[in-house]
Amino acid sequence: MLKQQLYDANHDTDLKLERVKAKELCHQYNQLSPADEQGQQKILYQLLGKMGANCCITAPFWCDYGYNIELGENFYSNHNLVILDCGKVTFGDNVFVAPDCGFHTAGHPIDYERRNQGLEYAYPITVGDNVWIGAGVQVMPGVNIGSNVVIGGGSVVVKDIPSNSVAVGNPCKVIRPITEDDKKTYWDR
């Protein structure tokens, strides 16, 4: 999977067992009381590859393997986060993810014969520091999102987004840079 080559996720016994283990941990996590922060942290430490301090994932949360996910410091996600981590998914520090977002490293061949064999590929996703991902955003395989970025709600991110930018749309495109004026609050303008 991590070699960015075609692999068989449907018939590989080890991968199937690893996905079941991750789904079990996600299920346990999603059943916890929202007040059980200690229980949440315990499961996330079992599930994720790396987790910085002050991380919060609001249930429900689902992933494929978990061990390919790395969270930086002060990561926060709202409800319904899905991370298909067949490839590495790395989040920097101070990343906020709004509800109903997905990070999808897995893809399938366009050629139906290979696709029907159960073959798929995975490309890593990287999100830099100080990033806000709006509600309903979907990030596709191989995307790199720079630091100090805002991705507008409902966007489908299919190409890299440079640092210090606001990007939105389907497909997601940079609409403007982030400037010093953005440090002013809306009521100061």
Regions found by a protein language model. Give the residues of each.
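Flexible, glycine/small-residue-enriched loop-and-beta-strand segment within the central core
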Residues: 61-71, 76-145, 170-189
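Terminal amphipathic alpha-helical/low-complexity segments used for targeting or macromolecular assembly
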Residues: 1-54, 172-189
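Conserved catalytic segment of ABC-fold P-loop ATPases
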Residues: 146-149, 162-164
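Conserved metal-binding segment of the jelly-roll/cupin
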Residues: 151-154, 160
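Acidic, glycine-centered active-site loop in nucleotide-sugar glycosyltransferases
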Residues: 161-163, 168-171
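Short-chain dehydrogenase/reductase
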Residues: 132, 150, 166-168
